[in-house]
């Protein structure tokens, strides 16, 4: 009887359902049996590697540094123009307020201290009011090859703050006419609707803080000719796709608080903003990752700037002193690698130097006090085992 019972149990076990298992399939990849190769890092391999890296990174760093050095650039910090400049006459811009990186080869009599500014009140016809303009006069000693770009640079402005960066409604930017309740339920807090419960268009902190200083084209004083810049094609194609013409009617929405100066009577059929064509807004809405950043304001892709003395007028609207920031004008050319930024080239050269120094030090160490490969005297576990051996032999 017990034998029959055992037979039934074994039959049931063999014929029953197979138990589920969480073991991975029996493959080379899943069972980690794929063939591998691990290099043996001997001095003959590691030491030449240091020198090879130094030889590679050195010329690369030199090339990057050269590409940055050929970019011609003028940077003027005009934050204090309203307090330091005069309404009566031009005065020299303090040297700490500007940097000029021009090609001066073959230039005779170029004065590095040739940047001046002056304040002037000019009637803004759109605003119907007098506006302070900072007029900056500077000298270009050599030809600036097109394309030429004008950027504005801000410091201590944290566009990467979480509340600021998320304060935008993508549907509204795509032209969807959201109701007040829909805007309140979105991401535009704290600038969603006005006191009349009208949605702000565009809503959110990013749009409200749009950089609104204005830049004129350059005027050459020698012959009073104008070097014209354009505000077209300053936004990336990916940024342009974020914005479409709105389906709002002017009476349904209100301008953001910081836009009221430009739209004192609200939106009308004639001044309703079309975000799909406002490239300055599109550029601004791409938030910067660092508190110091530059954004493209204007460009000229065809005409060179010839040597001479130029003037540019900047309408002063954007406040920066409230957050201890600065604002600067950047007039620049570019190289195949972009604008002037020596950091990457310097970093490559430093890495190259470090590799060569380490390679030299380790090579000298290897020749002065060579170490035998696979010397068992350096195995800690081996020495510990030998130390324990006498004690283990004493055990009963």
UniProtKB/Swiss-Prot annotation:
Residues 1-30 are annotated as: Disordered. GO terms for cellular component: endoplasmic reticulum; endoplasmic reticulum membrane; Golgi apparatus; late endosome; phospholipid-translocating ATPase complex; plasma membrane. It is found in: Endoplasmic reticulum membrane. Its main location: endoplasmic reticulum. The chain crosses the membrane at residues 45-65, 131-151, 342-362. Keywords: Disulfide bond, Endoplasmic reticulum, Meiosis, Membrane, Transmembrane, Transmembrane helix. Coiled coil: none annotated. GO terms for molecular function: ATP hydrolysis activity. GO terms for biological process: meiotic cell cycle; phospholipid translocation. Disulfide bonds join 81-134, 188-203. It is a multi-pass membrane protein. It holds the Pfam family CDC50. It comes from the Eukaryota. Belongs to the CDC50/LEM3 family. Accessory component of a P4-ATPase flippase complex which catalyzes the hydrolysis of ATP coupled to the transport of aminophospholipids from the lumenal to the cytosolic leaflet of membranes and ensures the maintenance of asymmetric distribution of phospholipids. This is Phospholipid-transporting ATPase accessory subunit mug89. The gene is mug89.
